[in-house]
Curated annotation (Swiss-Prot):
The gene is moaA. Pfam families: Fer4_12, Mob_synth_C, Radical_SAM. InterPro entries: Aldolase_TIM, Elp3/MiaA/NifB-like_rSAM, MoaA, MoaA_NifB_PqqE_Fe-S-bd_CS, MoaA_twitch, MoCo_biosynth_MoaA/MoaC, rSAM. Belongs to the radical SAM superfamily. MoaA family. This is GTP 3',8-cyclase. GTP binds at R13, R63, T94, K154, R255, I256, R257. The lineage of its organism: Bacteria, Bacillati, Bacillota, Clostridia, Eubacteriales. It comes from the Bacteria.
Length: 323
């Protein structure tokens, strides 16, 4: 269906949990352990009900996020049941990759088509520093197992000033040697991210162009989503740029988000939305739920305003919202 600005909304991002097995520095405080109580999370049945009603009004693609979605029990059955919904064409997962390698075969057999894996460095010491408790080898193993099981892979990378800027060329080589896409995501001022200085994608692109032969004269191509892509000579995959801060893509936004506790967010930046979990637990019918979702989608804000401090911005951390 379309929102009031005429954008076709066909993509649902639904967070299964705020819990995570890492403590990435720009996402979560090092000693954080105060997560949403299980009784406040949407149940798997409630999640499935939301997906079904969204599918009935035009949602075609579902992405499961977190926190780390793979720490949520029952995720395989959830994917299996979502895959049974006729209108859903694609099920995807965003993950840090730590737990994925040993689960990807079963997930794929039950309907998972794509994964986005967060990876900001190829140096073990830096990986430990940024994630605080992670092991790089497990992420690389997960990428390998995804390719073995024909699950399409995108790598999401955040470049931070004075941390991993010197690894840009090493990171893009992942897309040279493998049929995967690597996307640079500009750091957004959400939660712990406000404490760090990111690098703009225009600067990253210039670094790449100095060392690699970029096809199509270096022009970026936007496909279905916020990323703009370039092709590099000899590369099996593409390089993408998600430039939320320097190149607003809101006019093409096609998504709606649901947080772990069932709050349907109309925009990543703004706090506007409605709690679907509470409505369901108060006994509303499927038809009533569908109408609430339709109204929420229709009222999506025109654009974010991350560059300005606003009284109506969402103060929550990314892991609480759903990355």
């Amino acid at each position: 269906m379309k929102d009031k600005y005429g954008r076709e909304i066909d993509y649902l991002r639904i967070s299964l949990t705020d819990k995570c097995n890492l403590r990435c520095a720009y996402c979560m405080e090092k000693d954080h352990n105060d997560f949403i109580h299980n009784d406040k999370l949407m149940t798997l049945d409630e999640i499935l009900r939301v997906v079904k009603e969204c599918a009935s009004i035009g949602i075609k693609k579902v992405r499961l996020t977190g926190g780390e979605p793979l720490v949520r029990e029952g995720i395989v059955d959830l994917i299996k049941n979502i895959n049974k919904i006729p209108e859903i064409e694609e099920i995807c997962l965003t993950t840090n990759g730590i737990l994925l390698g040993d689960k990807v075969k079963e997930l794929s057999e039950n309907g998972l088509k794509r994964v986005n894996i967060s990876l900001d460095t190829l140096k073990e010491d830096r990986f430990k520093e940024i994630t605080r408790i992670g092991t790089l080898d497990k992420v690389l193993y997960s990428i390998e197992k995804c390719l073995e099981n024909n699950v399409k892979v995108k790598i999401n990378t955040v470049i931070l000033e004075d941390f991993n800027k010197d690894e840009i060329l090493d990171l893009i080589n992942l897309a040279c040697e493998n049929p995967i896409d690597l996307r640079f995501i500009e750091l957004m001022p959400i939660g712990e991210g406000k404490k760090f200085k990111g690098v703009t994608n225009s600067e990253i692109l210039e670094i790449i162009k100095k060392e690699k032969k970029v096809l199509s004269d270096g022009k970026t191509l936007r496909l279905n989503g916020p990323a703009k892509y370039i092709s590099i000579e000899g590369f099996k995959g593409k390089i993408g740029f998600i430039s939320a801060m320097s190149d607003c893509f809101c006019e093409d936004c096609n998504r709606i988000r649901v947080t772990p506790e069932g709050f349907m967010k109309q925009c990543l930046h703004w706090k506007y939305g409605i709690n679907l979990r509470d409505k369901m637990r108060n006994g509303i019918s499927d038809e009533e739920l569908r109408e609430i979702i339709k109204k929420s989608i229709y009222e999506k804000p025109e654009k974010h305003n991350f560059k300005m401090k606003e009284k109506d911005e969402d103060k929550r951390f990314m892991y609480e919202i759903g990355g």
